[in-house]
């Protein structure tokens, strides 16, 4: 069974220690609810990942664990077969003992767009909301973060993350907890909070921004990356049904509207540092994710539109700082 005890130990003497009043019970409940289904099967695969400590790790320019020279061809083939049991792999890529996990998303491209604009992560405590399988968490560690906590309720993402962590050979201060942000108390403790690719999935985007604010210390930095549309501060797209075949997209604001929302939630120093139309090469079908991907979500005759006729995915990165809260919003 996946254990969270090392995380409990690491935060016992930190500014996250009051989280221990509720977190073990919440995670215990999650484990009981998932003792059937796919999780036990994936945990059995995790228990087979007994390999020597890697001869090299790199979290600065990639997520690389081992060079592949330590394993025989047979051992490498066995490891690849085990890792394929965690398919589909959506966020990455990962390089594990010479095995290239070519994920659906080129998450490294997003990191290259975002990372030049954020405050240095050196010695920071970081929260990654909706972290997926943890690719960006490893890059945050590589950028010098003291501790990285990711939250995502998906059992598959948890197991993909655990696979990489176990193969990395060290007890790195990087932890994925299978939680949604609504299960977090107001911690007021993180130096930087990332929310990338989450806001448009939330039924109440203002509540999500307030939840993100509640996790930051005063003066902490929010890094928000989300879908946007063109338009002024009153422009917000609310898809009638699906957007890009997704039935869980609720609100897609303009950059101006999003910045207004952040101001209303008592963030300051709000700035848009990047906008980017998602390229077909950034999100695509691969051998490690053989299902439909972006090309199937767009109009085959006009890739500037989704299959439903909405503007094709365009993403913006907004950076803001937590200010003293307005009592009317809390």
Swiss-Prot record:
Q: What class of enzyme is it?
A: transferase
Quick check: keyword Transferase in the entry?
A: yes
How does the annotation summarize its subunit structure? Answer: Homotetramer.
Q: Which family does it belong to?
A: Belongs to the class I-like SAM-binding methyltransferase superfamily. CmoB family.
Query: A GO BP term, please?
Result: tRNA wobble uridine modification
PANTHER family assigned to the protein according to its UniProt record, in alphabetical order: METHYLTRANSFERASE, TRNA U34 CARBOXYMETHYLTRANSFERASE
GO molecular-function terms, A-Z? methyltransferase activity; transferase activity, transferring alkyl or aryl (other than methyl) groups
InterPro entries of this UniProt entry? CmoB, Mo5U34_MeTrfas-like, SAM-dependent_MTases_sf
Q: What is this protein called?
A: tRNA U34 carboxymethyltransferase
Amino-acid positions noted as binding carboxy-S-adenosyl-L-methionine in the UniProt annotation, renumbered to this chain: 91, 105, 110, 130, 152-154, 181-182, 196, 200, 315
This entry's Enzyme Commission designation comes to 2.5.1.-
